[in-house]
Regions:
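Short helix-loop capping/hinge motifs at secondary-structure junctions, enriched
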Residues: 23, 104-107
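Conserved Nudix-box catalytic region and its N-terminal flanking loop in Nudix hydrolases
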Residues: 23-66
Length: 190
């Protein structure tokens, strides 16, 4: 019966991890128990911040640690979806960060994943599949973000905004503060 169904909300965090190769940018996807491809991610532990959760889960699921990642501090994406598990309806919110790595070898946990692969963007979209539109959307956002960063000329960013007398960093609204130890994307000037 629908009335006996329990509703559960959960928040998880993870990473869209990429590396640059001679063939182009490749994205890491994990094969979840022979069912679908997705990013490394997992549940929060008590008192844990979302970035700390993403780092811990990525290390647990892939063997890729913080020391192997160059975290892109000005990117964060969200994915929302729901699914049924037993008599529960689960509503998931996924917080995804973006990070680059040079590490190729991944160590998966067999109880959670049955495989992994590094995919070029268009191949990643294909293996994710039509039913995972949120994952594909995040992958698109990450790919566009990376491509935009590659095209940016060296030197200070070109101002294209409504108030030409203000520096772009004074206009941009920060969506999140950097993790302790990370420099802000646009440091404040004295």
């Amino acid at each position: 019966m629908e009335s006996n169904r329990q509703i559960k909300k959960q928040v998880v965090a993870g990473f869209v991890i990429f590396r640059r190769t001679e063939d182009g940018v490749k994205y890491l996807l994990l094969y979840r128990r022979g069912q679908y491809w997705n990013f490394p991610k997992g549940h929060f532990e008590l008192g844990e911040a979302s970035l700390d959760t993403a780092l811990r889960e990525t290390k647990e699921e892939t063997g890729i640690g913080k020391e192997d990642l160059r975290i892109i501090s000005d990117f964060r994406a969200y994915e929302k979806f729901s699914f049924d598990r037993g008599n529960e309806r689960i509503f998931d919110t996924v917080i995804l960060y973006l990070a680059e790595t040079k590490k190729v070898q991944v160590t998966i946990v067999p109880r959670e994943h049955s495989g992994y692969a590094w995919f070029l963007y268009h191949d990643a979209l294909k293996v994710v599949g039509k039913q995972y539109a949120g994952t594909k959307r995040v992958l698109r956002l990450a790919n566009e973000f990376i491509k935009g960063k590659q095209r940016r000329p060296a030197g200070p960013p070109q101002a294209q905004h409504a108030h030409p007398t203000k520096h772009p960093s004074q206009q941009a609204e920060r969506r999140h503060e950097p993790h302790p130890g990370q420099r802000p994307a646009h440091p404040k000037r004295p």
